[in-house]
Design a protein with these regions (language model features):
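Short flexible coil/turn linkers enriched for glycine and charged/polar residues
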Residues: 14-15, 27-28, 94, 120, ...
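Short beta-alpha connecting loops at secondary-structure transitions
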Residues: 18, 337-342, 366, 407-420, ...
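A glycine-rich phosphate-binding loop feature that marks nucleotide/adenosyl-phosphate handling sites
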Residues: 176-184, 312-316, 373-377, 397-404, ...
């Protein structure tokens, strides 16, 4: 129960909610299922809160297990005092447990170990007691390992240095002082390794550890790893020495030297490693959280349904790869054209005619242009062609990860006859039609909507991003008859094998026409059906409930509800009746929870609703904008492509995304850009600064008269 109380205090949830979540999880329920279909039991906890409870429970269990191991080992040594036992039991972090365990930990033989084995501990005690004529006293401790007085005193020194360096109280004091008062610094180590001067602001950098921002920590780590920067610390050494000296009754030159060695050779390097690790962990957590939030918004971008799209994968020498897909994402044709240099004039003219032919033949409505190599030149080419073709627009699509997908086993299986580049063009087109369905085919780490994602723990990053994808897929729901195995595998209760079995079943038996039929899929057992059924939509079913998010376990309640309200079919009259019900009393009548009833009614009122329709759709363009066309103070519309700790990057129709620095986001103080903007948002911006030489533009969310 003590563990539950800690979780409750930290997360602001009740003991009952914690018990419910952990019990349901132990029974095999998934986070999406608990969040959607067990709201009454959890008192409306969402996916993030449920995951936080599960994660903290695992963390506290691991901490308790480690404490148990450490206590047992120290007790075996016969050195477990009541005070030490209490300190370990009260420790709130694994790092604190390890600090307390350090003096008793088995370690490789050190100079201090050898000195203790040679019987020099009493000599070390004499140093602490300010023994007069220490050199004469040391003569009694000479041995084969320590044949001279100087050697013996040096050995005693080693014992004291290690003892002080491993003293838990002194280590904690040093740690707290460093946290409050020390600076982390960086200087230029090798300029030749930073030709573009990416790390220029860190060539002569210092910041209080207490004020260190996550993205700066990761920048220092990367610069150090690349050999560009040398990272160090500035400590209040004199202040620390005074604290250490206060611990000793005696004071002499020997003790001063012992303290100096313990602090500078042992304690500070150890604390620096700990601080660097902690700063990195905090920075990684922040970067992962930001990447996850960006990914969530990217996956929720409104799909452009029912449009014929031409995917345009730009390239210089090898030509642009085109792919036309119909309203359902089915590939109609692929082609290669040579629209930009080094192509000859005749090739470029032929490319124009071929693009116009494809647009007319397949009634293309939108062209999706990948934002990679040759994107700028390809955009200009497309814009020129569209002057001659009415009612067609283009969109610049973030193609990050498209090449990863196109070379994957999934893409090879889907389009075995096509080249990698043509598969990539199909992926770019489909990303516009249904971003979620297409992006789930790609490792989320390859999508590129974060900062320093390659510098953080890849295991933690994958876990966090997978959670985001799972959450969004289940919140949106999946058409079981059109979904790819990649999309199905993110549905609660389903795995790779079951997802592939569903697709195979469709291929062999035809369309699935009811949720009950799902049970016939091989390896899809009762628990998997319970977890997955509500998230799987079947538009072809005669039972309209199968087309909604209503779970089959609630079908009897819906039938009873319709009987009580006199509803025979879902028409306007039925909708009016549903809107007027008293949720609490009706839920009691139906013997279900009020939250469950609210969700049922919401699904009945909007059976085909798509969560993503409430989010912004991509901006369609028909003409290209050049950096030279921009003017300070000019008002533009744009789409947020990426959010980072220091601002947001916005696509305003020029080759490079413009940066809105955090200082240009609000007249009020904000801690983070995500308080104001999200990936996929449509924003009105004003040009704040133009750098033609570096081809950079700075933007502002504040109108010129508001900007500071």
């Amino acid at each position: 129960m003590e563990k539950y109380e800690k979780i409750a205090q930290e997360l602001g949830v009740s003991l009952k909610q914690i018990d419910t979540v952990l019990t349901l999880t132990a029974e095999g329920s998934t986070i999406p299922f608990i969040a959607r279909y067990r709201k009454d039991a959890t008192e409306n906890l969402d996916e993030v809160a449920i995951k936080a409870i599960i994660d903290m429970d695992k963390s506290l269990t691991a901490l308790a297990d480690r404490k148990e191991t450490v206590l047992a080992k120290i007790e075996e040594l016969g050195k477990l005092t009541p005070a030490l036992k209490e300190a370990i039991e009260q420790a709130e972090k694994l790092a604190d447990v390890e600090e307390l365990y350090l003096p008793y930990k088995e370690k490789r033989r050190t100079k201090a170990t050898i000195a203790r084995e040679a019987g020099l501990f009493p000599l070390a005690r004499m140093i602490l007691q300010d023994q007069k004529e220490l050199e004469r006293a040391a003569e009694e401790f000479l041995s084969e390992a320590f044949p001279t007085v100087k050697d013996a005193i040096s050995g005693a020194f080693d014992i004291l240095v290690e003892a002080i360096a491993e003293d838990p109280q002194l280590r904690n004091l040093t740690y707290q002082e460093i946290r409050k008062h020390s600076l982390i610094t960086s200087s230029l180590k090798d300029e030749s390794k930073d030709e573009k001067q990416v790390f220029q602001i860190y060539y002569d950098f210092s910041e209080k550890i207490a004020n260190m921002q996550g993205y700066r920590t990761l920048a220092l780590n990367r610069g150090e790893k690349l050999g560009v920067l040398k990272v160090g610390f500035e400590h209040p050494v004199d202040r620390l020495i005074r604290h250490f000296e206060a611990r000793f009754k005696s004071k002499n030159s020997y003790i001063e030297e012992v303290i100096n060695q313990a602090l500078k050779k042992k304690m500070l390097p150890a604390m620096e490693r700990r601080i660097r690790t902690e700063l990195t962990e905090v920075a990684e957590d922040g970067a992962i959280q930001l990447f996850s939030e960006n990914l969530r918004h990217l996956l929720l971008i409104a799909p452009l349904k029912g449009r014929v799209v031409l995917g345009f994968d730009p390239a210089f020498r090898t030509g642009a790869k085109l792919a036309v897909v119909d309203q359902t994402g089915k590939m109609l044709t692929t082609q290669v054209i040579y629209p930009v240099a080094p192509a000859k004039a005749a090739q470029i003219e032929a490319a124009k005619e071929e693009l116009k032919r494809l647009i007319r033949q397949y009634s293309v409505e939108i062209i999706a242009i990948g934002n990679g190599t040759a994107s700028r030149e390809s955009e200009a080419f497309v814009a020129e062609v569209l002057k001659e073709v009415p009612n067609v627009s283009y969109v610049i699509v973030n193609e990050s990860g498209a090449s990863v997908y196109s070379a994957s086993e999934l893409a090879r299986h889907e389009f075995p006859e096509l080249t990698v580049e043509k598969r990539s063009a199909i992926s770019i087109a489909r990303r516009l039609q249904d971003p979620l369905a297409e992006l789930v085919k790609i490792d989320p780490k390859s999508i590129g909507v974060g900062q320093y994602q390659h510098d953080v723990s890849q295991k933690k990053l994958s876990e966090s991003l997978d959670f985001v994808v799972d959450t969004v897929v289940n919140q949106v729901g999946v058409n079981i008859n059109t979904a790819s195995p990649a999309l199905l595998s993110h549905v609660a209760g389903l795995n790779k094998t079951i997802s592939e079995n569903i697709v195979k079943y469709r291929e062999e038996e035809g369309l699935i026409t009811s949720r009950a039929q799902i049970k016939k899929v091989p390896r899809l057992g009762a628990k998997a059906f319970e977890q997955a059924a509500g998230f799987l939509r079947i538009p072809e079913s005669e039972n309209f409930l199968d087309r909604t998010g209503v779970h089959p376990e609630s079908y009897p309640a819906v039938k009873k509800l319709f009987t009580l309200l006199g509803i025979r079919e879902m028409d306007e009259e039925a909708q009016a009746k549903l809107k007027q019900i008293d949720t609490v009393s009706m839920a009691q009548e139906l013997e279900i929870g009020p939250e469950t009833l609210k969700d049922i009614v919401a699904d009945l009122l909007k059976p085909g609703r798509d969560l993503r329709d409430s989010f912004d759709a991509p901006v369609l363009r028909q003409d290209v904008l050049d950096l030279k066309d921009l003017k300070i103070g000019q008002k533009l519309e744009g789409v947020v492509r990426n959010v980072v700790d220091f601002g947001a990057f916005v696509d305003i129709g020029i080759h490079e995304d413009g940066l809105i620095h955090i200082s240009q986001m609000s007249q009020q103080f904000i801690k983070h850009p995500s308080q104001v903007v999200s990936v996929g948002d449509l924003v009105t911006v004003w040009v704040y600064k133009i750098d033609l030489e570096r081809e950079k533009v700075n933007l502002s969310l504040l109108a010129p008269h508001e900007s500071n």
